């Protein structure tokens, strides 16, 4: 793992996690783990069996100490401890919203920080995870977009967010206890900091780990990857991950989308929609989710709603309408509730589900579009953020 440069900030907590000599096993695919064990001295004829045993200890039981892997011989446990570690991101802060939403500020290698959000609901719990430190896309309505990209997360740092949340929620099974089918983390959405498709290989490997049936065991139908429209990677996502897809659409003309989602200048609406029409067939997905943030006077007219319906015609889809979540220095305002409902009504009458997302975690800046590492927030004033947003 390449250590990224440490950036200074206002926190007094030590900025860098201790370096260890062992290779982190978290985030390795089965194939990578198999190779690592052989390189560490595991006889090749035993390696496949050892992969299965270690995999279950880490991802089914949530064990972090090789000494607790009691179906392995003591000398083999010692070999593992000498060569490897089971390391997760460190929780710097945990905030709990009035609505039960939890936001974790997590420290990763190099002293960098990312945010992860857990959203409890009546019959499920959704974990929103990050794929990058910062973001390259500079979407003008998104707080994360005001933080420049520092680096991609490793597969281990992506999987680690899921494991940290399960730790905090006490969701790992206990040996000998009755099996509990209730899942507190039942869904994962790649909608946190960063553009997942600009970190494709690590996201793919992380999702392979999360979906593996002998560990965390989340169905690919319980995982949603959200992209701003990185067209060359969309077919690969269908073929190599196969999860559900959400698209940050947000506008119905190239002129408006160029401003809101600048990557549209590279892959415009027509090009994006052509790629999306193929996704359900390639991935066996039932439908694509179009995410549409409601910005007062920008993209929320009746004509926008009718144009949206025309654009997505023929694509199995639903449209998630997202009331804009304001942040310090934001140049936009949330559409009025009546305007949002009128927009939703037009889309619904055209035959598409058009739920209005209930903002969650606004009081702790955990709502959609509000994520940004606390170190970056502390480094800039509201005036600086506003100036960047106008630029």
UniProtKB/Swiss-Prot annotation:
What are the annotated disulfide bridges?
128-368
* Binding-site positions, S-adenosyl-L-methionine: 194-195, 226, 248-250, 325
Residues that coordinate or bind [4Fe-4S] cluster? 135, 139, 142
CDD domains this protein is in? Radical_SAM
EC number(s) recorded for this UniProt protein? 2.1.1.192
- Which GO cellular component does the record give, naming just one? cytoplasm
Task: Recite the UniProt cofactor note for this protein.
Answer: Binds 1 [4Fe-4S] cluster. The cluster is coordinated with 3 cysteines and an exchangeable S-adenosyl-L-methionine.
Q: From the Swiss-Prot or TrEMBL record, state where the protein is found.
A: Cytoplasm
Which biological process annotations from GO are given for this protein? rRNA base methylation; tRNA methylation
Record-level Gene Ontology MF annotations: 4 iron, 4 sulfur cluster binding; metal ion binding; rRNA (adenine(2503)-C2-)-methyltransferase activity; rRNA binding; tRNA (adenine(37)-C2)-methyltransferase activity; tRNA binding
Active site residues per record? 115, 368
The record's catalysed reaction(s) read:
adenosine(2503) in 23S rRNA + 2 reduced [2Fe-2S]-[ferredoxin] + 2 S-adenosyl-L-methionine = 2-methyladenosine(2503) in 23S rRNA + 5'-deoxyadenosine + L-methionine + 2 oxidized [2Fe-2S]-[ferredoxin] + S-adenosyl-L-homocysteine; adenosine(37) in tRNA + 2 reduced [2Fe-2S]-[ferredoxin] + 2 S-adenosyl-L-methionine = 2-methyladenosine(37) in tRNA + 5'-deoxyadenosine + L-methionine + 2 oxidized [2Fe-2S]-[ferredoxin] + S-adenosyl-L-homocysteine
Membrane-spanning residues: none
Please report the stretch or stretches of sequence annotated as the Radical SAM core domain.
121-363
Its function, per the record, reads:
Specifically methylates position 2 of adenine 2503 in 23S rRNA and position 2 of adenine 37 in tRNAs. m2A2503 modification seems to play a crucial role in the proofreading step occurring at the peptidyl transferase center and thus would serve to optimize ribosomal fidelity.
Family from the record: Belongs to the radical SAM superfamily. RlmN family.
Miscellaneous remark of the record: Reaction proceeds by a ping-pong mechanism involving intermediate methylation of a conserved cysteine residue.
Designated name of the protein: Dual-specificity RNA methyltransferase RlmN
